[in-house]
Amino acid sequence: MLDLSQYPSLGAALRDALEQWSEETCLIEADRDRENSRHTYRQFNAAALPLARSLQEMGFAEEHRTAILMTNQSKWLISAYAIFYCGGVLVPLDYKLSAAEQLALLTHSKARFLIIEYFLWRALRSAPGFADCKPEAVLVTEAPAGADLGGACRWEECKGQGDPAFVPRSRKDWASIVYSSGTGGRPKGCVLTHENYLEQCRSLISLYPFAPGVRYLSILPTNHAIDFMVGFLGPFLCGATVVHLRTLRPEFIRDAFPRYRITYMSVVPMVLKNLEKGLRDRFGSLSPHRRFLLRCLIGLNRVLTRHRPNLKLSRLLLKDIHQAFGGELCCLFVGGAFAEPATLQFFYDLGIAVANGYGLTEAGTAVTLNDLKPFRPDTVGKPLPGVELRILNPDADGVGEVVVRSKTVMSHYLDDPELTDDTIVDGWLLTGDLGRLEASGHLQLAGRKKNMIVTEGGKNIYPEDLEAAFEGIPAKEFCIFAANYLWPQRALRGEQLVLVFHTEPGQKVSAAVPEELAARNRRLPDFKRISGYLLWEEDFPRTASMKIKRNILAEQIRKKLDRSTAVHQL
């Protein structure tokens, strides 16, 4: 086990890990029912160092920013390590964003190098504005033979001659720029340091140790803060094995558990719900006799493990279920969005512990995590080691804004000192989430103070980022809010977006307006669609630079309108 407190950078820690566990398997890449590749730590190192040398031959230098745009695959992790080895700054981008959104973030991050999958590169080159932000060097993976790469290099051919120069970095140096939100509005690039990552990793593995022989199933995109930490850094720094699955099809996820004897996996609530549905469907297809027996065994397991998990007992009582998950599954981690307590309880009753947590990119991923001592599905656990957590201005029920102080909290927002000063005050990160801290140390979330929603898939949606999609509607002016921001409620489920439609006093809205809004909605992914609109007859309050004062407008709406009667559903 490496002593991460003694390391100055991720590059240095990963370099030693690759040497210490050289013959252990570090990475398996699987796609549906076939295995694409398998790397030991030695082979992974042998693949990354020629790439690092090639980058340096192209002019890559210390602190150069490099964006990665790829689906889950081994080349993502190999590229990330090469960047850290060369002393660079990683910019992980979401491959599911539109090409226009990706270009906006590439421009904002000032990335000088880009490593990208071929189908994404083809779309990016066709997007308006591409010529204005093309990086100095582009490496394209998985390009077909003879494909026009537009001056880019083939990743597979980037094998420099000789050994690359290892570039040391310090704990306070930038390690990555991670975008915590969208794209159409004000980009929020979280600058995370090497210390942020090293301390976060130390905290997590103190509760759930990775080690050689542990097998972690990675299904979330590696650009996702959760998977980057527990699907790459955590396992690699401890000699464990990561299984990258390049599909989200439920049947292939289920098959991967027994095939690779998975120990841990991280999921977002949406994936957990899909797994629950699959299991309930299977249980429903059993004969009445077997269904009754199963209910009895589940009930017995629930009683015997009501205080804390007992894997040996659960695997004995519910052997068939645990064998379906490979027989070695210890825990599922769930985060990124609100998880229904009933779903967590469902898995716990089967003897499959689900450790839910709470975090945000600005805090280096995780802030709290359930240690399952005892199992508390109604909370998001206790603060991780090294994390201070307080409730700011609590009300009579003890509910207030959750604020965090830790070595894992980001350095700042990229090129946005105003937003940084509003978000980090006297060393405390203002999360914008409401919660209550119990005497036991468990955190209960109770809603949001900020104008945003989090989808079941773990995506942060900031309403102002969506307004461009509704430009041109027949309104004097409009803006979009999270309904729970306009009318705060003690809930994190059923979050919705509402469009505020500014009309002239007494003006009636024609039937064409909701039709137009519905048409615009259909062009958006489901998780970005507005659920309704409301009419507002007063001018929007604005700053001297004509920006909408959203907090003041929200307060005005809150005082004058009732949600149940004001919102017209689409």
Q: For each predicted feature, which ranges?
A:
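Structural core segment of the AMP-binding/adenylate-forming
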Residues: M58, Y85-E157, E495, P505, ...
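Conserved C-terminal "lid"/linker of ANL adenylate-forming enzymes
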Residues: F481-A482, V498-L499, A518-L570
